[in-house]
Amino acid sequence: MQSVIAQAKRIVVKVGSSLVTNDGKGLDYDAIARWAAQIAKLRSIGKEVVLVSSGAIAEGMQRLGWVRRPREIHELQAAAAVGQMGLAQVYESQFGRYGIRTAQVLLTHADLADRERYLNARSTLLTLLSLGVVPIINENDTVVTDEIKFGDNDTLGALVTNLIEGDALVILTDQRGLYTADPRKDPNAEFVDEALAGTPELEQMAGGAGTSIGRGGMLTKILAAKRAAKSGAHTTIASGREANVLERLAAGEAIGTQLLAPTGRLTARKQWMADHLQLRGRVVIDAGAVEKLTSGGKSLLPIGVVEVQGEFARGEVIACVGADGREVARGITNYSSAEARLIARKPSSEIESVLGHLNEPELIHRDNLVLV
């Protein structure tokens, strides 16, 4: 088995907090120097690299003299603001030794949920890569709340991979990779060297939360791989403690767990819809509509809508769920939530008489719909 990284041209590398900090006590300059050296090597063999790096909050805690990660959101935001300065400085310094420029890019979910901002972020990152710059990406923890509380850089790494149409995502952690069970508790646990991303059994194998410094456990990595696979990108989960792990992966050595994308890429527009983490509304659809969407590739008509939940405007991305609450698709709605409630369970021929106008005969056209 050969590493998929060997054939990848554009790679997103996510480095966890434990790999860039001294056990949470500020940044580990020597470790960051090693990451810069390895990425410089990848650049020298023609690969484009985007780095998603944790460590800002840990560095901020060190600079502020805090021993334990705070629970208050405003304190976490303050630590992130202070620590981001140090993180940017050390990366700039270390990459500068190889004549490589870096760029700091801080993102929030709102940046990727809005279509115009999404395209702007994409254009900026692709321009940076074309200029030979290594973008250093992190969540903009200073201005958001839910990302600090529930977010993680594994998910961000997958979103960035999809954003730039990357070939591969490398998630570096302090663990070897994925096991069938927790090897610390189960002596019969077997190592998983390769699997298809999105396989349901993988989520059952994955454990819970991460360290007290970081936020992501193995489950977040499995879900990140599943998300990245929707754009056709393969994911490697490997130990960042392995010597020269990035260089060895690029040389084709099989290290860690490879989660392969089972399908080709979604179109850019559908990828944007699939990557929405927060939706303002959803529609519950009947069994017939579920069948038409999942098997027939049809549009969603108002007559198939049983219930409208949430408040949304025309042009927003909403979820389509079955009677069991499971999301089957999502797409751009042609009608607001108020309008959708009025035309639900009605044939398209009655839309104009009910609303006084007709935007489209479909609630969501199949060209603006993606299965999940």
Curated annotation (Swiss-Prot):
Substrate binds at S54, D141, N153. The keyword Transferase applies. InterPro entries: AceGlu_kinase-like_sf, Asp/Glu/Uridylate_kinase, G5K_ProB, Glu/AcGlu_kinase, Glu_5kinase, Glu_5kinase/COase_Synthase, Glutamate_5-kinase_CS, PUA. It is found in: Cytoplasm. Transmembrane segments: none annotated. Pathway: Amino-acid biosynthesis; L-proline biosynthesis; L-glutamate 5-semialdehyde from L-glutamate: step 1/2. GO terms for biological process: L-proline biosynthetic process. Keywords: Amino-acid biosynthesis, ATP-binding, Cytoplasm, Kinase, Nucleotide-binding, Proline biosynthesis, Transferase. Its EC number is 2.7.2.11. ATP binds at K14, T173, D174. Residues 280-358 form the PUA domain. GO terms for molecular function: ATP binding; glutamate 5-kinase activity; RNA binding. GO terms for cellular component: cytosol. It catalyses: L-glutamate + ATP = L-glutamyl 5-phosphate + ADP. PANTHER family: GLUTAMATE 5-KINASE, ISOPENTENYL PHOSPHATE KINASE. Belongs to the glutamate 5-kinase family. Catalyzes the transfer of a phosphate group to glutamate to form L-glutamate 5-phosphate. This is Glutamate 5-kinase. It comes from Cupriavidus pinatubonensis (strain JMP 134 / LMG 1197) (Cupriavidus necator (strain JMP 134)). The gene is proB.
